[in-house]
């Protein structure tokens, strides 16, 4: 919004040309989202408290968590508010990638809001049924996957539509340009062609998988938000590189026109996340709830797909992956041993993984900070793939 206004007025005020610099707008988006969160945070907490939207805590969880019962949840609305305002103010609103990322983020946010609302109203930690939640995630994820299959390879919506129609006329069997290939980290000029269907399936799995992985990780005060900020900032760097014809050519990455604008979105997400952490650090004054976790995970997955760094997201988001795998392994092993031995056995003391470490004697703050450190190292490792190829 401000970019369009500055471009309109820059002939009369040359200093407004600074708005054309992506890095300047990224910094301002971070500051804007951060200030919105810090200023509005206390009011959001008071409102959530007045609405009596307290978190229902699992009775079978660590006993130290029982004191958290009643802490306001649905604090993710504060994050989404900061992201929305900062992105709308500082991003180029004619950019197609901004709108598809916003659609996924706020679409998943709505799903999370409904889930949180049911938890609060019915005092049930389970919320929406897994089937219902998965259905609506799939609707949004598949829509985004189909659109992105064609938009990452073309520079305008008109050409995106032309490519889509060419695919339809080919009997849904046409391939995609090299820009849509699956990129392999640490390898130069080698990628795996996915085709339209392969791209759609992979994108769907990345977006929905990232959303649920972040949601599973959100179980301790401050645990999930800092990894989201770190991974989001790292993806913002990739977006800046892929969106630049100069840097992408120098680093031997495909140039994806318009992807650089996602740096603004990632910056807004980082600022909003840090503001939320101010109130979510131990002992938390509010929890983000599914409205925040599902939305942020979907956002990370969508950005990773656009900048063609699905595998790097898997690396940088290693904490999210480990948390998800711990749940899958726990459930699978329990069912297998119950069939085999007549009683279910557990691989971990409790899943997700952060609860296992809590029950192993780690304090909550130790788990959180150590997971942050691991994520920082993984993000630095992921960023090294920019040059080590």
UniProtKB/Swiss-Prot annotation:
Annotated GO MF terms: metal ion binding; phospho-N-acetylmuramoyl-pentapeptide-transferase activity; UDP-N-acetylmuramoyl-L-alanyl-D-glutamyl-meso-2,6-diaminopimelyl-D-alanyl-D-alanine:undecaprenyl-phosphate transferase activity
Catalytic activity: UDP-N-acetyl-alpha-D-muramoyl-L-alanyl-gamma-D-glutamyl-meso-2,6-diaminopimeloyl-D-alanyl-D-alanine + di-trans,octa-cis-undecaprenyl phosphate = di-trans,octa-cis-undecaprenyl diphospho-N-acetyl-alpha-D-muramoyl-L-alanyl-D-glutamyl-meso-2,6-diaminopimeloyl-D-alanyl-D-alanine + UMP
EC code(s) of this entry: 2.7.8.13
Pathway linked to the protein: Cell wall biogenesis; peptidoglycan biosynthesis
Xref: InterPro entries: Glycosyl_transferase_4, PNAcMuramoyl-5peptid_Trfase, PNAcMuramoyl-5peptid_Trfase_CS
Membrane topology: Multi-pass membrane protein
Cystines in this chain: none
GO-annotated biological processes: cell division; cell wall organization; peptidoglycan biosynthetic process; regulation of cell shape
Cofactor(s) the protein requires to work: Mg(2+)
Places the protein is found: Cell inner membrane
Function of the molecule: Catalyzes the initial step of the lipid cycle reactions in the biosynthesis of the cell wall peptidoglycan: transfers peptidoglycan precursor phospho-MurNAc-pentapeptide from UDP-MurNAc-pentapeptide onto the lipid carrier undecaprenyl phosphate, yielding undecaprenyl-pyrophosphoryl-MurNAc-pentapeptide, known as lipid I.
Protein name as catalogued: Phospho-N-acetylmuramoyl-pentapeptide-transferase
Source organism of this protein record: Paraburkholderia phytofirmans (strain DSM 17436 / LMG 22146 / PsJN) (Burkholderia phytofirmans)
Gene assigned in the entry: mraY
